[in-house]
């Protein structure tokens, strides 16, 4: 694990949706750090704020108050153009719904963010990712010709292709069966252990969380516990205590 500046951190994060009597406090004073070179999972019951936390940490949503840093950059100091550039250059995203472009091949989807940015992909690195996720025979296929697990492996390779400082994964196995889930999660864990990548994953699945090195538990917009060296059984027991 790398030392020094965290890959991302939040201080006293508050997120309020709505106003007056209809206001909902989705994040209620959260402070959290995600170390570089670590695989972290965020868990909690439905409505606990876990996806809101990830979206605010990744610059996809704005916080009501508090500070979010990606590396040493505070997001609130950036204008829209600078924030877009930071998300493109320093953050990788993996979503539950894959978010692949249906008219592009797997290979074209993997390098799409760099193509849009006008940057030449590092071919040796992209080739290594393709072989690690086992997609070499499928590179010329479009998403409709791939299984859900294969599509998510394309999305995972795309997230890492530009060597981002941090990857945020929002329920990356939510649409997958257990075998496909294990393949995607195994790749994310390998990316941390062998490639020194940083991954922060939101999940509701204790088995998925067990692939992480650290699990942060949320309830009612607050961090209520965390666990290192998690197992599916220990995570499930803790979640039962949170009422999910």
Tell me the role of every PLM-derived stretch.
Residues 6-214, 218:
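ABC family nucleotide-binding domain
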Residues 222-244:
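Conserved beta-strand-loop-alpha-helix hinge in the C-terminal portion
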């Amino acid at each position: 694990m790398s030392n020094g500046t965290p890959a991302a951190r939040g201080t006293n994060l508050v997120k309020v949706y709505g106003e007056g009597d209809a206001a909902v406090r989705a994040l209620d004073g959260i402070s959290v750090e995600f170390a570089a070179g670590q695989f972290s999972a965020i868990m909690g019951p439905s409505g606990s704020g876990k996806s809101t936390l990830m979206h605010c940490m990744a610059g996809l949503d704005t916080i009501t108050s508090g500070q979010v840093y990606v590396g040493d950059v505070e997001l609130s100091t950036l204008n829209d153009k600078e924030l877009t550039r930071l998300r493109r250059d320093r953050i990788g995203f993996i979503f539950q719904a894959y978010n692949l472009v249906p008219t592009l091949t797997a290979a074209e989807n993997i390098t799409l963010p760099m193509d849009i940015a006008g940057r030449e992909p590092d071919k040796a690195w992209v080739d290594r990712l393709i072989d690690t996720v086992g997609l070499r025979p499928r590179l010329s296929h479009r998403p409709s010709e791939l299984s859900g697990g294969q599509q998510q492996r394309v999305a995972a390779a795309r997230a890492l292709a530009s060597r981002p400082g941090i990857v945020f994964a929002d329920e990356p196995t939510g649409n997958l069966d257990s075998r496909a889930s294990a393949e995607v999660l195994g790749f994310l864990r390998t990316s941390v252990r062998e490639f020194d990548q940083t991954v922060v994953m939101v999940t509701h699945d204790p088995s998925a969380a067990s692939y992480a090195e650290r699990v942060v538990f949320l309830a009612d917009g607050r961090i209520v516990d965390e666990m290192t060296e998690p197992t599916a059984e220990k995570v499930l027991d803790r979640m039962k205590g949170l009422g999910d």
